[in-house]
Amino acid sequence: MEDAHHHHWTMVERRGTQLWASGRPFIIHGFNTYWLMSFAADQATRLRVTAAIAEAGLNVCCTWAFSDGGYRALQTAPFHYDEDVFRALDFVVSEARRHNMRLILSLCNNWEDYGGKAQYVRWGKEAGLDLTSEDDFFSDPTIKSYYKAFVEAVVTRINTVTNETYKDDPTILAWELINEPRCPSDPSGDTLQAWMEEMASYVKSIDPVHLLEIGIEGFYGPSIPELLPVNPDEYSGHAGIDFIRNHQAPGIDLASIHVYSDIWLPQSIKENHLQFVDKWMQQHIDDAANLLGMPIVVGEFGVSVKDGKFGNEFREDFMKTIYRIFLSSWKEGVIGGGCLLWQLFPEGAEHMDDGYAVIFAKSPSTLSLLANHLRCLEC
C-alpha cells in the first residue's frame, strides 16, 4: 500500500498492461461504495463517509460523482449544479486522500438510480426535443452537450477543501464515462461506439493526464462473432456493447468488466457459476493483454445474499475465484489492473444494502478474505 505521508503522492499511470505509481507497480485492491457524495451532503451521515474510507483497509474506492435531478442532486438541471453537493464531493475526495485511498469517479449511470441517462432524456423532452428512447442519450447532440458540460464542471472543479483542481489531483485514479452503458436499440454497437469515442476524446481534451475507463460490463459484440458464446446469454450480444471494439476507442486506458453471475445465469447450480466466472475472467484477461494491451479492471463483482438463493459461503467462493484468477495472471506478468468488490459498507449504512453489501462489523470471514488477498498482492 502507498502511504501519501511517506511517499510522493503521484498520479497512477499506465505502462502497457500494468499500472504504476510512485515508481513501482500499483495494483487495485478496491471496493465500490456509490453513495459517498450523497452521504457527505448531509451532516447527519457525513461521518459514515469517513468510516467507509478509513475502515476498508483497501487502496481504491469507486464511487459516483453524479446525481442528476431528484433529491440532493449535484446536477439540478442542465448546466446548473448545487454548490453544497459539490462541496460534499470535495469532502469525499479530500477524505480519500487523507486516508491514502485512490478514487475511480463515475460520471453518469445507464440506469435510473441517481438520475442517469433517463434523466438527461427527460430534461431534453422538457426543452422541446423530439426524443423517443432513453438511448437517445447516446446520439442526440443537445443531450450530449448536457453531458459534456457536466463532465467539464466536475473535471475542472477546484476542491474547496484542498484547493486543488480535480484534473490535477492524484487522489483520482481514473474517470469512468458511464456505469454499465447499454444501447439495445442499436445492437450493431455503432451508436454506443460513436458516443464512447466522442466522450473519451472530450474527457482527454480537458484532462489528458488521468486514466479513463468506460464502465462497461464486458459483453462481447458482433465485431468478433466467435467470442459471443463467452457471454452469459444471447441477449448480452445484442446490448450494443462490444468489449474489444469499445476498448479500442482512442483515449481509453483501462479494460473494464463486471461479474454478476447471480444475475446473468438463470440456474443456481453453484459449480456452474464458478465455471462461468473462471471462463469470463480468463477470456477478458487474455483479450485485455493480447488484443488490447491494457490493464484490466474488474470494476464490480459480487453476489447477492438477499433472496436466499446464495449464501455468504458461496459469495466467498465466488470472491476467491475472482481473486485467484487475477492474482495468477498478475504474478505471471500477463496483466495488471485489479478488482473492486460490489460493495463494502460501514455500520450505519445497512439501509442502503441491495443484497450485495459486505458490512464491516458483520462479515469477519469476508474481511479476512480481503486481507489475505492483500497479503498475496504484497508478497
UniProtKB/Swiss-Prot annotation:
Q: Which residues cross the membrane?
A: none
Gene3D superfamilies in the record, alphabetically?
A: Glycosidases (3.20.20.80)
Name the residues that bind substrate: 64, 179, 260, 342
The alphabetical list of record keywords is: Glycosidase, Hydrolase
| Tissue expression from the record | Expression not detected.
GO biological process entries: polysaccharide catabolic process
EC nos: 3.2.1.78
* Enzyme active site: 180 (proton donor), 300 (nucleophile)
Which domain of life does this protein belong to?
Eukaryota
Q: Name one GO molecular function term.
A: mannan endo-1,4-beta-mannosidase activity
Which family does the record assign?
Answer: Belongs to the glycosyl hydrolase 5 (cellulase A) family.
Q: What is this protein called?
A: Mannan endo-1,4-beta-mannosidase 7
Q: Which organism is it from?
A: Oryza sativa subsp. japonica
